[in-house]
Amino acid sequence: MTRRMLVCAVLLALPLAAYGEDKTIKRPPVATNPAFETMKKLAGTWVAADEGGKPTDQVMSIIKVTSGGSAVHETLFPGQPHEMVSIYTVDGPDLVMTHFCVLGNQPRLKADSQSPANQICFQFAGGSNLDPTKDKHMHSATLTIVDDSHIEVAGVGWDGGAPAKDMCCGLKLVRKQ
């Protein structure tokens, strides 16, 4: 049994080792748009702001650029029981987000290309593991870039095909220095 496992491990590791050593792999250019470039600039750790707008110790969001610059990965409420992930990518001309919710669904939202200059406004564009006419889910979100160190996030959740009053509270975040 141990020999079989060793053979399987070697067979699985060979392609990974070969890929890791080949520095000549040609990648196509990464699709982009202005809103996606804005999202990339938000990479870092974001903490809750106190009532005066000053940073606290409460980490609320960790944003990083990944996958060769083709995706932005956001972890919301890291380490908490309600931790969630949102992935931002470019699909054709559009910035899109898939939100992996603590509710077990994955709403997809598309950024409105006509959003104000300091905002990215996302609207529901489908999803997995949800029926938008019945199930509770995130339905829209607005990210406001106040300045390089301050952002605000407001969302609207839906339940039963209508806005829900108990979801997606607003957040005021400060970039951790």
Regions found by a protein language model. Name each.
Residues 7, 11, 171-172:
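General secretory precursor processing signal
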Residues 1-7:
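Bacterial N-terminal signal peptides that target proteins for export
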Residues 21-177:
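Hydrophobic small-molecule pocket/channel-lining residues, especially in calycin-type beta-barrels
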